[in-house]
Amino acid sequence: MAGSRRKSPGITPDILLRAYSIGLFPMAESADDPEIFWVEPELRGVLPLDHFHISKSLAKTVRRNPFEIRFDHAFESVIAACAEETSGRPSTWINQTIRSLYSTLFDMGHAHTVEAWHGDELVGGLYGVSLGSAFFGESMFSRRTDASKICLVHLVDRLRNKGFTLLDTQFTTEHLKTFGAIDVPKADYALLLAAAMESPHLKF
């Protein structure tokens, strides 16, 4: 993980929002570690909203509407699912402190979810933080094929419609790169972030 990181003795929701506004975000070493540290990558993952790409096969799946998509319906369930250990994700950086902080941000109107439902079953989702005209994606999970991908498609559509200018993915992965995610040097990211923070806080 290239970039700076520093431990924090204590974080409040207001401090957390301030950190996002200057390019920091929190992580924990593991779910069982109560400590949190700040991360500021040298290369920041950004998914340009005007260059979002989906494959033909995924576009076809989206048109079939295999899941009901809901927004901000089950925040606690989404963040709990994102924190679960799976075969592809044997450890998690989401500890109880982070879960509590983001639940408070949800109550404040700054944390949001996109959820895929199959009947009464939550089968995929993602959560993140909105501030100014920026959305900071935190984590996602999937229990059915393409569920989290479809949530991402709906997230981008919603952000575009609401006038958001920045979708921050923190880091890039090969998975996110297929959607158009790029690595942005810290100095260039700071300019994108500053512009997004000058905007009034947009309603998600």
From Swiss-Prot:
Chief site of localization: cytoplasm
Gene Ontology MF, one: leucyl-tRNA--protein transferase activity
Record flagged with keyword Cytoplasm: yes
Compartments in which it is found: Cytoplasm
Keyword Ubl conjugation belongs to the record: no
GO cellular component: cytoplasm
Catalytic activity, as annotated: N-terminal L-lysyl-[protein] + L-leucyl-tRNA(Leu) = N-terminal L-leucyl-L-lysyl-[protein] + tRNA(Leu) + H(+); N-terminal L-arginyl-[protein] + L-leucyl-tRNA(Leu) = N-terminal L-leucyl-L-arginyl-[protein] + tRNA(Leu) + H(+); L-phenylalanyl-tRNA(Phe) + an N-terminal L-alpha-aminoacyl-[protein] = an N-terminal L-phenylalanyl-L-alpha-aminoacyl-[protein] + tRNA(Phe)
Any one biological process term the GO annotation gives: protein catabolic process
EC number: 2.3.2.6
Family annotation (InterPro entries): Acyl_CoA_acyltransferase (IPR016181), Leu/Phe-tRNA_Trfase (IPR004616), Leu/Phe-tRNA_Trfase_C (IPR042203)
Top-rank taxon: Bacteria
Keyword entries, A-Z: Acyltransferase, Cytoplasm, Transferase
UniProt-listed Gene3D superfamilies: Leucyl/phenylalanyl-tRNA-protein transferase, C-terminal domain
Record field: transmembrane: none
Functional note: Functions in the N-end rule pathway of protein degradation where it conjugates Leu, Phe and, less efficiently, Met from aminoacyl-tRNAs to the N-termini of proteins containing an N-terminal arginine or lysine.
Family, similarity comment: Belongs to the L/F-transferase family.
PANTHER family (UniProt xref): LEUCYL/PHENYLALANYL-TRNA--PROTEIN TRANSFERASE, LEUCYL_PHENYLALANYL-TRNA--PROTEIN TRANSFERASE
The name this protein goes by in its record: Leucyl/phenylalanyl-tRNA--protein transferase
Organism annotation: Rhizobium etli (strain CIAT 652)
Gene: aat
